[in-house]
């Protein structure tokens, strides 16, 4: 409750329009900050459970602050209490080192070919929107969903039917999910955290987009924070950090954030 009051008051004071929460679905692995999801339909006990989170969202809405939550549909952990070997086999995915630069992250990538997997993930997203009145879903790790060779070494991955490295099943899942959320007509939106430069994340002037509402502009965030961290005496030669984003601004529907 104190978090609700303090958080909403701070947002009003600093004139924020939305807040984005780190993953609130239950997890065990503290090192991954909640991105190795254990329970896709359960609020983590760290914030007090379901009722406490509903109170937090309601307080934000009453203060005129929209609520966005991070959601991970790219991979899950190997904890025995979670989805790993759920039925004694690979019910939800298959093992792959999807984050090669962090070999200690033992994760399983979802197999989007399976109808049960697509239904499970879509049901999870809709549950957060319906039951907790979340305004927006930020999909984390979209790049790792889009590429079959993400984080893999040559010779350790299998190309798609066309010989490419695109994960065609994941692409179709993302399109279906975004279209389903858009059809709700209640203003809910999706944000892609996509770092590979994939063309066509949003519908802005793209022929075959993934249909995300927005793409998070991580480059702008990095440049802006670097500029603000520069001593004012030396900012004269750093203004290009504030204007560079206009070179690609109209290629996607970007969202600017300090996340």
Language model region names:
Residues 21, 40, 60, 121, ...:
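Conserved, mostly hydrophobic/aromatic
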Residues 25-63, 77-116, 124, 143-168, ...:
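Aromatic- and acidic-residue-enriched carbohydrate-binding clefts of CAZyme catalytic domains
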Residues 24-26, 72-76, 142-144, 195-197, ...:
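Active-site beta-loop-alpha junctions enriched in small/polar residues
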Residues 115-136:
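Switch/coupling sub-region of P-loop NTPases
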Residues 17-19, 135:
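Short acidic/polar active-site loop segments enriched in Thr and Asp
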Residues 64-67, 190:
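Hydrophobic beta-strand scaffold residues
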Residues 133-135, 150-259:
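Conserved alpha/beta catalytic core and glycan-binding cleft of carbohydrate-active enzymes
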Residues 1-7, 11-12:
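Single conserved hydrophobic/aromatic residue that forms the stacking wall/gate
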